[in-house]
Amino acid sequence: MKHALIIAGSRGLGFGLVREYLSRGWHVTATARTPSDELAALRGDADGRLVIESLEVTLIAQTAALATRLKGQSFDLLFLNPGILLGRGAALSDVPDSDIQNIFLTNAISPIRVADALAYLVVPGGTIAFMSSDMGSVSTNDDGRAELYRASKAALNSLIRSFRARHDKDDLTVLALHPGMVRTSMGRPDAPLDVDTSVRGLANVIEARWGSGGQVFVDYRNEIIPW
């Protein structure tokens, strides 16, 4: 039975991914800063296939502690889902420095730090997936909206490519995934996709690209996005 490690799996798309992989018969280990009631309830219905671990992704010490707790386990999939949206619609000159630091630390730096700490737990031929966004595509940025969020995801994409280069001898598939425009607390209330549709598509993409190696930036329909 396959085993997924989902980082930031308590709410929104992360929770949807936990639910999706459980429905496919996987074992799932999900991390959360503070587990939601929904995640705790899901554990009770999962017949022992869901483990919840505590993690604040921006704290290096907590990441190291998680790596120690998980030592000896192996995972077919490591999915890194941390993300926040700050300064929506604000001019960069109006966004506090603390918000700028927080969004880059959460959206770009921390996913790579966690991946570096946990990559050794991924089985040969396994997959490391990062929740990116088409807004992180530099070459398709024609409207400039959501500048801070867009820049943080572009930074994540650059770091994903560096991560893959550092792990070029490892038998891994590395995916930067765009979930589509989804109705979540971070998304728009009028977004065209619900969480279930998005995560089902993401899981299908991961399955379709299993064992392909290399790296790719792709959306939930398995369509390539230019970096």
Question: For the regions a protein language model found, what residue spans apply to each?
Answer:
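Conserved glycine-rich Rossmann-like NAD(P)H-binding loop of the short-chain dehydrogenase/reductase
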Residues: 24-40
